[in-house]
C-alpha cells in the first residue's frame, strides 16, 4: 500500500488533523499536516492506541448475506422462463461485556452448586431413614429375645421347685406357656417387619416423588431450550455467532440439549442434480402420530326407515366394502348405492358390533299432522253420495236430472271419464254427489270414490241387469263398508224386468227390503224424472240414520278427488272438504305437493272464499299436480309443509327404486330365458290425473310375453316439445288424451316424423294400441303343399345331372319352389326345384295329369318310385 498524506488519513478516520498530529506525537512520531504517513507508522499508531485504551475490540458486528437462485416460471405463451431471485439478509450481533459474562457464569455455578447441595441433602436423608429402620428392627428383635429368655428362666425355676411327677395339668400348662411364648415372639417379629416395610415404602415414595419432580424440571428445561428462536442461515460464521449468543442467553439448559438424531443429519447437505448442495432441512417441531385403538370402537348408529349401504358404512366409520361383505355373509346381495330397509340395516350394524338406535323419519310429518287435527264442536254435515254402476246405465243422466243441467253432453262419447263432484241444494237439505266412470279402465277412480263417500247409489239399467262393472261397484262399496242404495234406471224402456234385476243382485248379497233384506231399492227414470224425489228422500233418510257429523270450524282436511295441469292457471286440484273450513290463503299439504291457496272455485266455476265440510272445490296454487286420492291438510307453517312434502317425495322415490331393484332381481333369470321381447314405447299425456292413471293401468294390462307396453313418459297437460324430443329419441308414439300439442311440439313432430295420436274416448285408445302391438308380433309361417309328382324314370343330363321323369298326380308343380324328395313316405332330401321341362320346353308350371322332367338342385340320387313334393311357405299375421 502506498504512503498517504496525514490530511487524507484524517479524512478517512473522520478525525481532525490536530488530534491526529497529537496522537502521532504521543506515539513518538513527529508529524505535520502536510507530511506523508507510511504503513509502518500507521501500525505503530494503532498499537499505541490499543495499549492506551486497553486493547478493546468491537462490541458490535453486522453480517450481510446475499443468496441467489433461479425459478422456472411459465409465461403467457406456456413456455418456461428463468427468473433470477436474489435474497438479502442483514443481522447485527452485539458482544456482551466481561462483567455480564462473569455474572452469568457465577449465576450458573451458584445454580449448579444449589442443585448439588439439594441432591446431597436428600441422599443423606434417605440414608438416615434406612439406618433408623434397621436400628428399630434390631431393637425389636433384641427385646423379643430377652422376653423369651425370661420366660425360659421362670419355667426352669418352676420345674426346680416342683420335683414331683408331672401331672396332666402341668403338661397342659407347659404347652400353654410354650404357645404363648411362641405367639409373643411372632407378634414382635411381625411388628418389626411391618414397621420396617412401612419405613422402606415411605422412603421409596419420597424417592419416586423427587424423581418425578426432577423429571418434570428436566422436561421444562428442555422445552424452554427447544422453544428458543433459532436463526438458520447458510453462513457458517453467522451460525456460529448465533449459537454462542443463544447459549449465553439460555444458560445451562442449552448445554443439556440432546444432539440431533442421525436420521435428520442423514439428509442434510445432499447434492442436487445440478451439483449444488441443498440447504439443511429444518427439523419440524410439530409431530403427529396415529395410535391404533386397543379395542373395537362401539358406536351408536341411528337408522331410519330406509338407508343406503354407503350411508350405513359412513355412520359406522367403516368402508362400504366391509358392509357389503357382511351382507354377503348373511346371504344378501347389495351394491354401494342400494337402499336397504330398517330391519336389514339393524341386523348388519349389530353383526358388526355397534349399538343401533331406531329413528322415525316421519317425526316432523306426524307432528304437523297432529297440529292440524285440532278438536272442536262437531255439527251435522251433508252426506257425500257416490253414483256407481256399469257404463251407459244412466249414472250421469240421473245426476244431470237432479242438477237440472246437461252434464253428460260435455263428456266425450257420452261416457264419464272424470270424477265429477257437485253439491245440490234440495228442499230437505244439501247433498254432495260424486259421479264416477263406469268403464273397466277406471277401477281405481271408482275405488277412490267409494272411500271418500258416505252412501253409494248403485245404478242398474232395468233392461240390461247386472253387468261386470256393476259387480265391481258392489265389491268397492263392501270394501269401504258403505251403505248401498240401488237405483233401478230406465224403467220407462221396453223390456224392463225388475224381478230379474233383484234376482241377479241377490246373488251378490244385495237383497231388497221387499224380499226381507237391508238394501233400499228405488225405481227411477233419468229421462223423465220418475222416482227421483223418492231417491233423494231415501238418501237423506239413510244420512239421518248414519248421524253424519264433522268439525265445522278449524283447519280443513279433505281428499283430492281429481287433479290436472291447466295451461293458464297451473296445477288445479279438485278437493272434497271433509272437516273444518278451507279458506283463501291457507297453506295446503296434498300428498307430495304443497302450496298456498291462491284461488278457489266451486263446480260451476264461480270463485268462493270459504268451503265447509262436504263441499267440493277446485284449488289453485299448489307446487305441482297431486295424485288423485291423496289427503289434503291445512298446516300452519309453510316451511314445515315444504319439508314434509320433500320428505314424502324422497320416500316415494326410495320405495320406487327398491321396488324396481326387487323386480330386476326377481325377473333376472326369466328375462335371460325369454330372450328378446318386442317393446311398444309410448309417451302418454292426459287432461287429468285420474284418466292418466286409468289409461296407464289399462295399457300395462295389454302386455304379453312377446310384446310389452313400455310407458316411458307420462304427465298431465298438453304435449310439449320435451315430450316430442323424448318420443323421437326413443322411437315412441305420442298419445294425447283430451289434450293437444303446442306449436313447437307440432313442428318437431313433423320434422322428426314422430307418430302422434289424439283420443277423446278410452275405447278407441286401447283398440289402437292393441292393433299396434299386433303389428309387433312375430308372424307365423305355414307350409302348404302345392303339388306331388311320382318319379317314373331317371335320365342323365351332362349339364344338370340326374333328371327325374315324373307324372304330376296332385296339384301343380311350379319352378323355383322348395321341394322334398320322399322315399317310402320318408323325407330324404329337401331343396329347390332347379329345372322343369316338358318335351324340351322350359315351363314355369305343370298341372295335374301331365308328364314332365324335374331337375333337383345339388341332388343326383333320385330313384324310380320316389315322390317329389312341392310346397310354398305362407306368412300368417297374428293378432292379440
From Swiss-Prot:
PROSITE patterns: G_TR_2 (PS51722)
Basic residues: compositionally biased ranges: 269-279
Subcellular location: Cytoplasm
Residues at which GTP binds: 389-396, 435-439, 489-492
One GO MF term attached to the UniProt entry: GTP binding
Compositional bias annotation for Basic and acidic residues: 142-229
Stored Gene3D superfamilies: P-loop containing nucleotide triphosphate hydrolases, Putative DNA-binding domain, N-terminal subdomain of bacterial translation initiation factor IF2, Translation factors, Translation initiation factor IF- 2, domain 3
Annotated stretches, region: G4: 489-492
CDD domains: IF2_eIF5B, IF2_mtIF2_II, mtIF2_IVc
UniProt-recorded name of the protein: Translation initiation factor IF-2
Gene source species: Psychromonas ingrahamii (strain DSM 17664 / CCUG 51855 / 37)
Gene for this chain: infB
